[in-house]
C-alpha cells in the first residue's frame, strides 16, 4: 500500500472561530486506539464540545466525539473518552504557562490526516463576549461589502 501524503480534513470546528479570539495555533498528534483510527478513516468525528486541558505536565483532549466503529466488536472505544495529545516539551511548557495565566483556553479547530497520521490543530484562545461576537460579525460584513463594491468599480458596474 503506498504511503499517504498531504493533508485530508476529517472535521472542522467552525464555531470556535466565532466564540473565541484565536491567539496562537499548534499542531498536535493524537494517541488513538484501533477502532478510533478506523472511525476517523470513515470521516466521522465532531469537535463541537471539545477542549484541551493540562494535567500532570501532559495535554489531554476532552469531549471530542469519535463515534464507535460500526464493524467493531467488544474492542470498540468509548466515543467521548479523553485522548492524550502529542506535543514537544517546549510547546507543552509554553501552553501550561499561558493557560494558567487566566482567561485563556485550548480549543480544537481541525482534525485531519497528515502523511497518514491523525493530527489535531488546537488554538490558544480567549472567549468572546456576546457584544464582541456581534462586533466581529459586523466587521466581517463591512469588509465583504467593501470588497464587493471594489469589484464592481473595477468591472465598471457602478450603483
Swiss-Prot record:
Coiled coil: none annotated. It is found in: Cytoplasm. One of its GO terms (cellular component) is cytosol. Disulfide bonds: none annotated. Pfam families: SmpB (PF01668). It comes from the Bacteria. Its main location: cytoplasm. One of its GO terms (molecular function) is RNA binding. Keywords: Cytoplasm, RNA-binding. One of its GO terms (biological process) is trans-translation. SUPFAM superfamilies: Small protein B (SmpB). Belongs to the SmpB family. Required for rescue of stalled ribosomes mediated by trans-translation. Binds to transfer-messenger RNA (tmRNA), required for stable association of tmRNA with ribosomes. tmRNA and SmpB together mimic tRNA shape, replacing the anticodon stem-loop with SmpB. tmRNA is encoded by the ssrA gene; the 2 termini fold to resemble tRNA(Ala) and it encodes a 'tag peptide', a short internal open reading frame. During trans-translation Ala-aminoacylated tmRNA acts like a tRNA, entering the A-site of stalled ribosomes, displacing the stalled mRNA. NCBIfam families: PRK05422.1 (NF003843), smpB (TIGR00086). HAMAP family: SmpB. This is SsrA-binding protein. It comes from Frankia alni (strain DSM 45986 / CECT 9034 / ACN14a).
Amino acid at each position: 500500500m503506498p504511503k499517504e501524503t498531504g493533508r485530508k480534513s476529517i472535521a472542522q470546528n467552525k464555531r470556535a472561530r466565532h466564540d473565541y479570539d484565536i491567539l496562537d495555533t499548534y499542531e498536535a498528534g493524537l494517541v488513538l486506539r484501533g477502532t478510533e483510527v478506523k472511525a476517523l478513516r470513515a470521516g466521522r468525528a465532531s469537535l463541537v464540545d471539545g477542549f484541551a486541558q493540562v494535567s500532570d505536565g501532559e495535554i489531554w483532549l476532552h469531549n471530542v466525539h469519535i463515534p464507535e466503529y460500526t464493524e467493531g466488536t467488544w474492542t470498540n472505544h468509548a466515543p467521548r473518552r479523553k485522548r492524550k495529545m502529542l506535543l514537544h516539551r517546549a510547546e507543552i511548557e509554553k501552553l501550561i504557562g499561558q493557560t494558567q495565566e487566566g482567561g485563556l483556553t485550548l480549543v480544537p479547530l481541525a482534525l485531519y490526516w497528515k502523511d497518514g497520521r491523525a493530527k489535531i490543530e488546537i488554538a490558544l484562545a480567549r472567549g468572546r463576549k456576546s457584544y464582541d461576537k456581534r462586533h466581529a460579525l459586523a466587521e466581517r460584513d463591512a469588509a465583504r461589502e467593501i470588497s464587493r463594491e471594489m469589484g464592481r468599480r473595477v468591472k465598471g458596474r457602478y450603483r
